[in-house]
Amino acid sequence: MESIEEKAASMLQRCETVNLASVSMEGYPRPVPMARISSKGFSTVWLTTGKDSLKVKHFLENPKAGLSYFENGNCVVLTGNVEVITDLETKKQFWIDWFIEYFPNGFEDTNYCLLKFKATYATFWIDKEFIHKEVKEV
């Protein structure tokens, strides 16, 4: 029988879009839908955005974040931290061809950056099972 964490990881693999919330300069949550470009398990998610975006400004000021995803009435809500990644090697590793529409200079585009979300706490509602738990480092 699959654990709730395994179910959540499988669900995340099927979700193309997640909601990522930063904390604004005024202290309010600012959730935005974003394309999930990669993930590990249920709790580490990679996303991309422009280095000049408001969310990057927020995360550089305060890395605390929330991330949620859902499918067919099931959902996972995570809290954790976001790291803004700008090193060329990692940017190249995660580059996807459709990014060229937003970053015309490819993975070397100075505005292209990655966001790495790592959860510290999770709330699961999957198959009518409701669980809150700390996320252990893997």
Q: Could you describe each region identified by the protein language model?
A:
Residues 34-37, 82-83:
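Hydrophobic/aromatic beta-strand elements that line small-molecule binding cavities or substrate pockets
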Residues 37-71:
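A short mixed-secondary-structure module that forms the rim of ligand-binding clefts
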Residues 10-24, 65-67:
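A short, Trp-centered hydrophobic/proline-enriched beta-strand micro-motif
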